[in-house]
Amino acid sequence: MGDKLRLSIGILGNGASLLLYTAPIVTFSRVFKKKSTEEFSCFPYVMTLFNCLIYTWYGLPIVSHLWENLPLVTINGVGILLESIFIFIYFYYASPKEKIKVGVTFVPVIVGFGLTTAISALVFDDHRHRKSFVGSVGLVASISMYGSPLVVMKKVIETRSVEYMPFYLSFFSFLASSLWLAYGLLSHDLFLASPNMVATPLGILQLILYFKYKNKKDLAPTTMVITKRNDHDDKNKATLEFVVDVDRNSDTNEKNSNNASSI
């Protein structure tokens, strides 16, 4: 009964993770359409790739016992493919400055994964020590992946806008981490359960922020130039220009702008 329940939770976790990995398709369709990465960050996708690489390796028979963690291999293998595509698209449309940022995070991830596989395969002789080593690296990778939206959450709080924190990405992150937490506990595997003990509360926090700010727009000031012309003297037409800051979230300023435009 326990094994069947664990397998069922693993299948549900696969489904939730698949939704999590495919959620950025909406974001990258926007990037592709506008041919710009705008204010989106590539850091979460690079960290997700690192997580997928580590846990695919963790689930293979060279680290785990036989195919006891097959669900990890299947879903993280798909994740590697999807995240690689997302990172390529981001890099292609990113500004030169953003491309440097991608390289600074992407190269250490690949080097870190290479070292992890080499050390676990060549230094340790048994599954127990390999799982302990790779699982420890996976713990860091998972916390980095689930914690990477903290950068976006900070932006949400500053701008009071959820434009760059899509709902489905936050929801599927919470759902996937909750299911993998249950899977790890049922498997008595702390290396699977521990990172999701951190990820689940972070997912809840993202959802709280989303629902708090979802109906609010960016509060960044917008500059408007209003011109008033004096037509009493055709030869000397005076033009008065002044600048006002418009708070797009303020009904009062909207009314003042409408009145000013009718002068």
From Swiss-Prot:
It is found in: Cell membrane. Gene3D superfamilies: 1.20.1280.290. Residues 9-97, 133-217 form the MtN3/slv domain. Residues 1-7, 64-71, 125-132, 187-190 are extracellular. It is a multi-pass membrane protein. Forms heterooligomers with SWEET11, SWEET13 and SWEET17. This is Bidirectional sugar transporter SWEET3. The lineage of its organism: Eukaryota, Viridiplantae, Streptophyta, Embryophyta, Tracheophyta. The gene is SWEET3.
